[in-house]
Curated annotation (Swiss-Prot):
It is an enzyme of class 7 (translocase). GO terms for biological process: proton motive force-driven plasma membrane ATP synthesis. The gene is atpA. ATP binds at G236, P237, F238, G239, S240, G241, K242, T243. It comes from Pyrobaculum neutrophilum (strain DSM 2338 / JCM 9278 / NBRC 100436 / V24Sta) (Thermoproteus neutrophilus). This is A-type ATP synthase subunit A. Pfam families: ATP-synt_ab, ATP-synt_ab_N, ATP-synt_ab_Xtn, ATP-synt_VA_C.
Length: 594
């Protein structure tokens, strides 16, 4: 089960390791650094090391673990901050006695779960009841916001059977809480189990994503929605607002459980994001957001190989909570850093480079990641539904969206929210470019909006989007010939598009009135702008100049509404405003006819 190092090249080690398996977890050197076998040639194994290899030398031992890199899944996950291989950073700090992570800290010193923690276990099954892998055996109240359901692990060795023993009471995480009698023998179930991070957890069938994931961000929810179980990408250059967008989603997205994965970002930026997340409160209960969050941190100065582990680790944790029947959101920031790590390791082990040096399997790895999102019927004897939504930022060098990571990501996602430096530098946030963004979920979530908010939602949304496209065309004419060359109708279109941009798309992420924006507030803000457009068209046809309409008091108030009307009074206040807006435009029209 052991071998010797032959050579070291940065994060990659070649070892003589008979019997090594692909993606097996190994411990490298005298200090037992975490590593993963990424290539096997005969008895030779190429290992990507998840810790700094400085000081390693040929001849040191490499010890096989006999199992793949796996996530530890069970109570005490919630609220933890992990590194890329699921070691709690708080424990590492206590052991290292330094701001920097000491090498060779194993799971024995920093276990991912507190196996000695005690919880009140409440069984959901009785002795004699038939159960299948994936069934809920009981639950523990881990935090005020989250009930942690204990599953009969869907491991390959577990088979359907009959509950032989289960009882309520106080148990440690490592205690046996049930015994299942199967054809293969007795299975003793503990509160926790391991799952290989590269293996997707099983489900019965995938369902169409029909319910929108409400994020409180108007540009996303209304114009380019994402459904629960969908996948989205947020590409953008430096300074365009990717991290703030991800932070806003982590705070206000209506998911029961959220997993931010800070993958390869700058250390000070990650620290700032962490401090922000730790201070955030759940908007519905006022309790700490950490009570329904697990954070994975892997900064740019940490070993590059661990970036890959952190992405898979976050997705596996997300699938685990999905299997409990929750709606889960995984936020990866950013997949470009993961791809760069993949490129470095691939080149170190001598694989043939593809476009821009990335390995030929880059699209495959991206597909494996994004395809783990989905709204699914869970396995087990009772039908339950859970969802895993993935939103990942992409950091293309120089904002070039044609580079391999961004262009390949486009193939596997349903919503694309590109951030524009032009909008960011003009202080328009979120800086999502409405001319380049798209969503494949508009048709599927339309039913939800029609049923819960208004049947007019799709028609008004499509009209506003077409006006933004029309504005871009008219701006070309204005740049060349000036506004004098435009008709009154075209001037009105420009005025309405300005209202859409300033009064709807623009949103202050740090203003409690403006963010989050409830679905009804979003719709009525949109309807108010649509009313200005529709009634204004009738007035212009009767000869009223667009400039006169623009100077009306209610129209002047349109861009400020988002900052003045709170979610709890939005329905009453905005309905009254729309009535007064229509009334004022019609009075101008009536005066014109006289």
């Amino acid at each position: 089960m052991s071998g010797r190092i032959e050579y070291i090249a940065g994060p990659v080690v070649k070892a003589d390791l008979p019997g090594a398996k692909l993606y097996e977890l190994v411990f490298v050197g005298e200090i037992k650094l975490f590593g993963e076998v990424v290539r096997v040639q005969g008895d030779k194994a190429f290992i990507q090391v998840y810790e700094d290899t400085t000081g390693l030398r040929p001849g040191e031992p490499v010890v096989r673990s006999g199992e793949p890199l796996s996530a530890w899944l069970g109570p005490t996950i919630i609220g933890k901050i992990y590194d890329g291989v699921q070691r709690p950073l708080k424990n590492i700090e206590e052991i290292s006695k330094s701001p920097f992570i000491a090498r060779g800290i194993g799971y024995d010193q920093a276990p991912p779960l507190d196996l000695k923690a005690e919880f009140d276990f409440k069984p959901a099954v009785k002795p004699g009841e038939e159960v299948s892998p994936g069934d809920v055996l009981g639950s523990v109240k881990e935090t005020e916001l989250m009930t942690h359901y204990i599953l009969y692990p869907p491991l390959p060795e577990n088979a359907p059977g009959v509950v032989e023993w289960v009882a309520d009471g106080k148990y440690k995480v490592d205690d046996v809480i049930a015994r299942i009698k199967t054809k293969r023998g007795i299975v003793e179930v503990k509160m926790w189990h391991k799952w290989p991070v590269r293996r997707p957890r099983p489900f019965r069938e995938k369902l169409p994503p029909v319910e929108p994931l409400i994020t409180g961000v108007r540009t996303i929810d209304t114009m380019f929605p994402i459904a629960k179980g969908g996948a989205a990408a947020v590409p953008g250059p430096f300074g365009s607002g990717k991290t703030v967008t991800i932070r806003t989603l982590s705070m206000f997205a209506q998911s029961r459980f959220i997993i931010p994965v800070l993958c390869g970002e700058r250390g000070n930026e990650a620290a700032d994001a962490l401090h922000g997340l730790l201070k955030l409160k759940d908007p519905t209960t006022g309790r700490s957001l950490l009570e329904r969050t697990t954070i994975i941190v892997n900064t740019s100065n940490m070993p590059v190989a661990a970036r890959e582990a952190s992405v898979y680790m976050g997705t596996t944790l997300g699938e685990y909570f999905r299997d409990q029947g929750y709606d889960v959101l995984v936020l990866a920031d950013s997949t470009s850093r993961w791809a760069e790590a993949m490129r470095e390791v691939a080149l170190r082990i001598g694989e043939m480079p593809s476009e821009e040096g990335y390995p030929a399997y880059l699209p495959t790895r991206l597909a494996e990641f994004y395809e783990r999102a989905g709204r699914v019927v869970l396995i087990g004897s009772k039908e339950r539904v859970g969802s895993l939504t993935i939103a990942a930022s992409v950091s293309p060098p120089g904002g070039d969206f044609t580079e391999p990571v961004t262009s390949n990501t486009l193939r596997f996602i349903g919503a694309f929210w590109p951030l524009s430096p032009r909008l960011a530098y003009s202080r328009h946030y979120p800086a999502i470019d409405w001319l380049a963004a798209f969503s494949r979920y508009v048709d599927t979530v339309e039913v939800w909006w029609s049923k819960n908010i208004s049947t007019e939602w799709r028609r008004i949304r499509d009209t506003l989007q077409s006006l933004l496209v029309k504005e871009a065309e008219l701006q070309e004419i204005v740049r060349i010939l000036g506004t004098e060359a435009l008709s009154e109708y075209e001037k009105h279109v420009l005025n309405v598009a300005f209202m859409i941009r300033e009064g709807f798309l623009k949103q202050d992420a740090f203003n409690p009135v403006d963010t989050p924006s409830s679905p009804i507030k979003q719709f009525l803000l949109m309807k108010a702008i649509y009313a200005y457009y529709e009634e204004g068209m009738k007035a212009i046809e009767a000869g009223v100049p667009a400039a006169v309409l623009r100077e009306l008091e209610t129209v002047k108030r349109l861009p400020r509404l988002r900052m003045e009307v709170t979610n709890d009074v939005a329905k009453e206040e905005l309905t009254k405003f729309i009535e007064s807006l229509v009334s004022e435009i019609r009075s101008v029209l009536a005066a014109r006819k006289q």
